[in-house]
Swiss-Prot record:
SMART domains: MoCF_biosynth
InterPro entries from the UniProt entry: CinA, CinA-like_C, CinA_C, CinA_KH, Competence-induced_CinA, MoaB/Mog-like_dom_sf, MoaB/Mog_dom
Species lineage: Bacteria, Pseudomonadati, Bacteroidota, Flavobacteriia, Flavobacteriales
Source organism: Flavobacterium psychrophilum (strain ATCC 49511 / DSM 21280 / CIP 103535 / JIP02/86)
The name this protein goes by in its record: CinA-like protein
Superkingdom as given in the UniProt entry: Bacteria
Membrane-spanning segments: none
Family: Belongs to the CinA family.
Amino acid sequence: MKATIVTVGDEILIGQIIDTNSSFIAKSLDKIGIGVHEMLSITDDKQHILQTLSLLQNKVDVVIITGGLGPTKDDITKKTLCEYFNDKLIINEKVLVHVTQLIEDYFKRPITQVNKDQALVPSKCEVLFNQVGTAPGMWLQKENTVFISLPGVPYEMKYLIENEVIPKLIAKYDRPFIIHKTILTYGVGESLLAERIETWEDNLPKFIKLAYLPSPGRVRLRLSARGVDENVLKNEISLQVQKLQLIISDCIVGFEEDETLEVVLGKLLTEKKLTISTAESCTGGKIASTITSVSGSSNYFKGSIVSYATEAKVAVLGISQEKINKFSVVSTQVAEEMATQVQKKFKTNFAIATTGNAGPNKGDANAEVGTVFIAIATPKGVFSEKFNFGQPREKVIDRALNQALEMIYKEILKNYSK
C-alpha cells in the first residue's frame, strides 16, 4: 500500500512555518504498514490543488491532505474538493452544534456566520469529527484512491489521525506487517561504522532493509522488516541485532526508536543512584538543557553553572586567575578545575565541564576556532580531552554536547556500573 501526504499553504512554501504534520502522519501510517510514497507541499491555489489531486488519483491508495480548512478566504481546500468531486457544500448539524458550543463556552460570544461556515462539508464526504477544534476532517473516495482532508493545526490533525483516520484505515485495508528496530550508536562516524558492519549488512535477508541515520556525534541504524508473518519478522530482527552487537558492542548505547543518549544516560544514573552537575562555557548551558529535557532528571541532575565570561569563571566557579593567565581560559587545566569546582559546589558524584572557542573569531584566548576541552570529574579524580570540531559555530556546540554526553556515559558504564 502506498500513500501521499499533501500539505496546503503558502506559509510553508515561503519558510514561515515548518511542516511537522507530514512527519507525524508518516510515522502513524508506517506503524500500520502503509508506506508513504511521497510528500508534497503546494500553494493555496485552486488549480494547483486540483492538478495535484488529479495526478494522485489511482497512483496511490491513500492521499492525506492537511491545511486550508480554516474560516478565512484563503482557506479553499473544501471548495476545491467539492469542485474535484463534482459536489456541493452542506451544513453538518453535528459539527454546527459542536462549533456553536465551543465558541460560546470558550470565547463567551455568539457564533458568527464565519464560524457557522466551519460546519460546511462536501455532501459526499464522511465527516471525521474533530473533538478538539472547529474544522472537521473529511473522508472521500474516487475510484481506487481515498482522499482524507484534515485541518493544518498540528494538535487537531494529531487528534484526527489517532482517533479517526488510523482506525478507519485499519478496518478498510489488509496491510503487511512492518517491524522497525533502531540501534543507537555513539563515537563512530557513519563511514567507519559502515566499514565495520559491511559483511553483516551484505548478509541481511532480502526482506530486511538497513538505513543509516547520522547526526553530530551519533549514528542510528534502523532495521526495517516487511512481510505477512509478524513472528518471523520479529525473530529475524532479534537475531540480526544479536549478530550486530557482537561486531560493534563498544559503540551501541540503546535500542529504542526514540531513545537518545540523554535518556540512556538518565536511566543509568537513576539505576546506579548517581548524581551529576555541569559547568559550561562554550556550550552555553546546552548540556544542562539536554540532560534536563528528560522527565525525572531532577533525581540525578543537581545543577549547572554557565560561566561564559572569564570573570564568571573566577568569581562564580573559583578558577584561579593565575591558572588562566598561565594556561589560557581554553585549556585542559581550566576545564578540569571547572569540573572539579562544580562537582564540589553541587556535591555530585560526577560533573561535566566545557571550555572552548565555538567561533567564528579566535577570541581573547586566541584558541583556534572549533577547539573545545571537555573535562569529567568523577569520584576518583578528573580527566579531560581536547577536540577540534571545526566550523560553523552551531556544529561546534552540538558536537561538544554529544561528545560530553558520550564521555560521561562511557566513564560510568566502564568504571562505575558494577
